[in-house]
């Protein structure tokens, strides 16, 4: 789009606590439409869409499918693509209203524990911040019941958990990293997602897929 600037994000990280603030400029991404995507022809096996809730045209309501993104994903699956979706963490009711209609048309749903909890309407950590493994498992099952086609993977600083359509499950602990060695955690979730998608593309066993995803996230920290 010649008349639109490229989208970008500035991330401000605290030196001590590691808290992050994101300043995002949508730019041309706000005008990415169903037509732009559906005219695409590619020999690739997996179509990855990111990020829902930041793509104005695709986040719009659709009378038949809930949101435009759901229609796009359904049509891509009909063309033979396996679909993957990433979302941006956002508070409020808009999150579920946009993400839920897409679930039946997503093959691989790879999200963090905050995003998984937001879709399911529950907290996956205790008030003290402890990861609740039973809730993680229940959230993955709930997401699969809502239509995810092949795999739901939930990642968190402690590691990752995955559930397949066939009912296979796996927990995998994160690879230990000394806090002082971490340069930034920005992009670690994306690195996990990339590792998991590569593993799915190569049809790797579930445990190996989680190990690769965790390793990819680990090396993103330096």
Question: Where does each model-flagged region fall?
Answer:
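Conserved post-catalytic alpha-helical subdomain immediately downstream of the catalytic base
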Residues: 146-151, 175-222
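Ribokinase/PfkB-type carbohydrate-kinase core domain
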Residues: 1-170, 175-176
């Amino acid at each position: 789009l010649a008349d639109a600037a490229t989208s970008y994000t500035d991330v401000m990280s605290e030196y001590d606590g590691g808290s992050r603030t994101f300043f995002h400029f949508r730019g041309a991404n706000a005008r990415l439409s169903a037509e732009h995507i559906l005219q695409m022809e590619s020999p690739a096996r997996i179509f990855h869409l990111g990020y829902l809730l930041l793509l104005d045209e695709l986040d719009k309501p659709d009378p038949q499918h809930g949101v435009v993104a759901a229609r796009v994903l359904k049509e891509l699956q009909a063309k033979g693509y396996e679909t993957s979706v990433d979302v941006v963490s956002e508070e409020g009711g808009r999150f579920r209203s946009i993400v839920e209609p897409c679930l039946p048309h997503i093959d691989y749903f790879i999200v963090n524990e905050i995003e998984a909890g937001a879709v399911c309407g529950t907290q996956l950590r205790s008030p003290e911040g402890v990861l609740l493994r039973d809730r993680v498992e229940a959230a993955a099952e709930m997401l699969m019941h809502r239509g995810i086609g092949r795999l739901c993977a939930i990642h968190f600083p402690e590691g990752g958990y995955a559930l397949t359509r066939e009912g296979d499950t796996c927990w995998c602990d994160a690879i230990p990293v000394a806090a002082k060695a971490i340069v930034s955690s920005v992009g670690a979730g994306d690195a996990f997602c990339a590792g998991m998608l590569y593993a799915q593309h190569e049809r790797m066993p579930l445990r190996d897929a989680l190990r690769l995803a965790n390793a990819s996230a680990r090396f993103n920290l330096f």
